[in-house]
Regions:
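Bacterial N-terminal signal peptides that target proteins for export
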Residues: 1-7
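Amphipathic interfacial helices
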Residues: 112, 122-130
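Hydrophobic helical h-region of N-terminal Sec-dependent signal peptides
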Residues: 9-13
């Protein structure tokens, strides 16, 4: 049994919904891969070939690379192959959040969250959307810290992530640094050089987090993201307090674009990149990472470029960012080989470019471990799905004909413990190193998403899945038109043939891996509703049982 699934069952998911299916794990150890063994490519030595995929393998890729598989993409991957699909996605024009907010008929508080839902469910550039969401959990800002009224600024920040999802990490780091939303969130905006008479010292907030969380981490890393140890077995620090103080001095003298006053500006532009005020910038000499010296007398922009180059070229960046992207997209516990292979692509792709996120994402998704990890390491491969992704997956699977203009699920965090750009701190909703107490921790593994899972959250997400399936399968159940109605037209056509219906739902929601026990539970429930007028009820209840099962809670 997969360890994550075992822990889910042990934490009483099924007790909260009143049923208890058995183990869904299928022994795949002796099965042949769906396509040929991995061959070397110019990007990564352990990439899978670009052959058409079986449906279950197409589903697995789409779970990793989108906000939920849809039938047309599963079928398309059965004709083309993963690399063709990835390339096509990377060429698809971006769907920007700010455009969606501007087009909204009204902009009540937190409307940007509803726009995020719309794009996650319906946008054609699914891979870009999923990568931007992953980046938003690494380069964190949050409306939860006094920015809730700055909807356009928040959407513009998210657009920076969308714009650079397949660009270069150095450019992303530059635009994130000068975002006034980031400037407000981590105190870079209005940061001043030292003035002892006024008891002013440069703020260290952004300097600390750009190093600790956004780029290199706290300790020196090998290419596989394992720590480099000293002779006593202690991890070597990547920087010290003096390093932070020097970077804090670099990050002085920036404020709103066109601000008329540095200390008390009235023109609060949360969209345009911040601009320098040289009189507030510390122009003294500084020492950065790896003892790189910054000469005295340089302006704010020149020093910023030197500092970001210094961070970007640190050897830690490749493994630090690569591992977190793997965790967000594919599996919580990637092997050292997987991380190293991807980090090497980040460090230098086939064109000799460092920091190419397009190459990095392709290396993550095309790596043998991403495609065959469920076979090679069935006990530990995979991850618990984030609550937001469990919701988008159910809505995408039964593609709604439309999303009502009055649709509102902006209060999602109170139910799911998670909302876009709303983490409780700069450390995101969960830490990449969080390890669930018990067997997971005992085995030295991590389980980030388990940090926001407990009995109460299980009940809440189950109730939300109930509302999004049984209660919302057509608009007549919602007189205000605020819910997304799943489209079960296809499923109603299949309903007379029970096996065909369950095979279809199995593919759409579980990638064809439904356990015999879960199938038996669903059949028993449908048998209990075996009267002509209950056909739609049988369908939506079957969907709910699958969507709320431990099998659907895991990405494998």
């Amino acid at each position: 049994m997969n360890l994550f699934r075992s822990v889910l069952i042990m934490t009483s998911i099924w007790l909260t919904v009143g049923c208890a299916p058995g183990d869904s794990t299928t022994d795949l150890s002796n099965q042949e891969p769906a396509f040929a063994p991995a061959l070397p490519t110019t990007e990564v030595a352990h990439a899978a070939p670009d052959n058409p995929l079986l449906q279950k393998d197409a589903f697995r890729l789409l779970e990793q690379a989108t906000f939920g598989p849809v039938l047309k993409d599963i079928e398309a991957l059965g004709v083309s192959g993963p690399e063709f699909w990835i390339n096509k996605q990377m060429q698809t024009p971006a769907t920007f959040l700010s455009d969606g907010l501007a087009a909204a008929s009204s902009q009540p508080w937190n409307e940007y969250i509803n726009v995020w839902w719309r794009h996650a469910i319906t946008a054609e550039d699914q891979l870009r959307q999923r990568v931007a969401f992953a980046l938003s959990q690494i380069l964190v800002v949050s409306a939860d810290d006094g920015l809730g009224d700055e909807q356009m600024g928040l959407t513009n920040y998210y657009d920076i992530l969308l714009r650079h999802s397949f660009g270069n990490f150095r450019d992303l780091l530059h635009d994130v640094t000068l975002s006034p939303i980031m400037g407000e969130y981590l105190s870079l905006k209005g940061n001043q050089k030292s003035d002892p008479e006024k008891n002013i010292q440069p703020d260290e907030n952004y300097a600390r987090e750009v190093l600790q969380l956004f780029s290199i981490g706290q300790v020196i890393l090998n290419d596989d993201a394992s720590p480099v140890l000293d002779q006593d077995g202690v991890p070597l620090p990547a920087y010290n307090q003096t390093t932070i103080e020097n970077f804090a001095r670099v990050f002085t003298g920036w404020h709103f674009a066109n601000a008329e006053h540095f200390v008390w500006p009235e023109n609060k532009d949360y969209i345009s990149a911040m601009q320098p005020w040289e009189q507030y910038h510390d122009k003294g000499p500084k020492t950065l990472l790896n003892n790189v010296e910054v000469a005295a007398g340089l302006g704010a922009q020149d020093e910023l470029n030197i500092a970001l180059d210094n961070i970007f070229n640190h050897p830690n960046v490749g493994p630090f960012i690569s591992k977190q992207l793997i965790q967000r997209l594919v599996t919580s516990n990637p092997t050292k080989e997987y991380v190293r292979d991807v980090a090497q692509v980040f460090n230098k792709n086939h064109a000799g470019e460092r920091g190419s996120l397009a190459s990095t994402i392709k290396a993550i998704l095309m790596h043998r471990e991403a495609r065959f990890g469920h076979i090679d390491s069935p006990d530990t491969f995979g991850k618990l799905k984030e609550p937001l992704i469990r919701m988008t997956q159910i809505w995408r699977a039964f593609e709604p004909l439309s999303i009502p203009s009055a649709f509102n699920y902006s209060w999602v965090e109170s139910e799911l413990g998670q909302a876009p750009l709303n983490s409780p701190s700069v450390f995101n909703f969960f830490r990449p190193t969080f390890s669930q107490p018990g067997e997971i921790r005992d085995r030295g593994l991590v389980s980030p998403e388990f940090q926001i899972m407990d009995e109460a959250s299980i009940i809440k997400i189950t109730n939300r899945l109930l509302a999004s399936t049984i209660w919302s399968h057509n608009f007549k159940h919602d007189s205000e038109g605020k819910r997304i109605a799943i489209d079960i037209t296809k499923e109603m056509e299949l309903e007379p043939d029970r096996k065909a219906l369950l095979d279809h739902l199995d593919l759409l929601l579980l990638g064809g891996e439904m356990s015999p026990e879960l199938r038996r539970e669903i059949n028993q429930l449908m048998d209990s509703r075996d009267y002509p007028l209950a056909a739609s009820q049988r369908v939506v209840e079957a969907i709910f049982l699958i969507a709320s099962s431990p099998e659907a809670a895991l990405q494998r």
